[in-house]
A protein has these predicted regions:
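Transmembrane helices and adjacent periplasmic/lumenal helix-loop junctions
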Residues: 129, 147-156
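Transmembrane-helix motifs of polytopic, lipid-linked glycan transferases
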Residues: 82-100, 115-116, 139-144
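Membrane-interface coil-to-helix junctions
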Residues: 24-84
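Aromatic-anchored segments of alpha-helical transmembrane domains
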Residues: 20-25, 111-122, 156
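Membrane-interface helix caps and helix-loop-helix hairpins in membrane proteins
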Residues: 120-130
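Specific aromatic-rich, kink-prone transmembrane helix
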Residues: 133-149
Length: 156
């Protein structure tokens, strides 16, 4: 049992963080979700997609407007935010490992800093989910670039 805890403490810590985010957005700060949901509109239409995609940051806006429409159910909205923040934490950890961070406890805790700062910033109702989506996309592209850069250079 102790060996299992030693091997799985990182995913458990990330899961605990995700549960805390869901509980926060579902119970005490449910009004923040409802506020953002009522002021955003999403149309599942090719014209609306093309109208959004031509603007800078349009893809992030389009994806976030799709996700925000589920905020009318606070648990689902909190889960969406938790998954995005957990993804940012995991991608930050992946980037940190690529740059030589040790796999110890303090090093892993540092990977939570971007997600926690973003969680605090999301308390401002004027910060839209498109910022979170764009940041997670940028981090993911950085991780993919670092992961496959040497392989692509050797092929080309």
């Amino acid at each position: 049992m102790k060996n299992l805890m030693i091997k799985s403490w990182k995913p458990l810590l990330s899961l605990l963080f995700g549960v805390a985010v869901v509980v926060f957005w579902s119970v005490p700060y449910m009004s923040g979700l409802c506020f953002q949901e009522q002021y955003q509109m999403f149309l599942f239409d090719i014209g609306y997609f093309l109208e959004r995609i031509v603007l800078p940051g349009g893809l992030a806006d389009y994806i976030s407007e799709f996700l925000v429409q589920f905020y009318y159910m606070p648990v689902l909205g909190g889960t969406i935010i938790a998954l995005l923040l957990m993804g940012i934490q995991a991608t930050s950890w992946g980037l940190m490992k690529q740059y030589g961070m040790k796999s110890d406890f303090p090093g892993y805790l540092l990977s939570f800093v971007p997600s926690i700062v973003l969680w605090c910033a999301m308390g401002d109702q004027n910060l839209l989910l498109s910022f979170v989506v764009a940041l997670s996309g940028a981090l993911l592209m950085g991780w993919i670039h670092n992961r496959f850069h040497n392989r692509l250079v050797k092929v080309v």
